[in-house]
Swiss-Prot record:
InterPro entries: Betaine-hCys_S-MeTrfase_BHMT (IPR017226), HCY_dom (IPR003726), HCY_dom_sf (IPR036589), Hcy_S-methyltransferase (IPR051486). Keywords: Metal-binding, Methyltransferase, Transferase, Zinc. The gene is SMTA. Residues 1-327 form the Hcy-binding domain. This is Selenocysteine methyltransferase. Present in all tissues tested. It comes from the Eukaryota. PROSITE patterns: HCY. Optimum pH is 6.0.
Amino acid sequence: MSSPLITDFLHQAGRAAVIAGGLGTELQRHGADLNDPLWSAKCLLSCPHLIRQVHLDYLENGADIIITASYQATIQGFKAKGFSDEEGEALLRRSVEIAREARDLYYQRCAESSSDNGDDSRILKQRPILIAGSVGSYGAYLADGSEFSGNYGDAIKSETLKDFHRRKVQILADSGVDLLAFEAVPNKLEAQAYADLLEEENIITPAWFAFTSKDGNNVVSGDSIEECGSIAESCDKVVAVGINCTPPRFIHDLILLLKKVTAKPIVIYPNSGETYDAIRKEWGQNSGVTDEDFVSYVDKWCESGASLVGGCCRTTPDTIRGIYKILSSGQSPTFSAK
């Protein structure tokens, strides 16, 4: 089933809609300390103004969709930090409020700007902007590296996962997000749990499933991307399916495999290609692609069938600006040396 929201949105976006880039890694670049099981959700407590600023930076560099700082924000995770269920729920709602504040501020700046922007380098353009509520995997909550392997052990069943995610999904949907973004889905078990949960709770907010891969054929657990894509295709609540937090070099092949099993829009937002050490909790130096190289893939991704394109970990507002420029003008952007 196609969603009027996503159909109309993509029609207005043109060639493809632009998704914001990395949130947690961009917060770190702004000085936030994310050495915590809550990761970027820690900033909901310590520096919400930084989250708002990063959202705004992405909007001013061409993003059409911003994603809430709730990837690793769970009621269970907040409870482990000493918060009550009610306080945890309030922090989830706050992640949506912050994104909405950034969108409102962006629209205000658009209204205040001159039509030609003069020498203003910001992209101030009145357009539909969607807020996607981020839902991270069960492995992201565990913060033990299993989000990168998809190996939860035999004791974890679909019911376990549904019960874990249920309240968070309800809160994000009730908070007024435009979309639910199920991100870095590592295995078919969790994908099926999400699909069943959306149906059981009759969630009316449209959703996308974005899987993560490290080889161009399978999700990180080893389950085939086609199997996982078929789960998304069979769920009427899911309006787009794709890949995130995966090296850019694998994306083209993954799009082609997904196109075999789904007619839904394809959503693509890879990471920079840098290697993350889940034990040391740090990114490998000089292991990724430059912004120029990242953006050079965009034409091929869109020609292969991608309808929504952005970035994940270690991509920046500059990356997103490059994507915006190549989609809006067809010209390869230039990047300043860093």
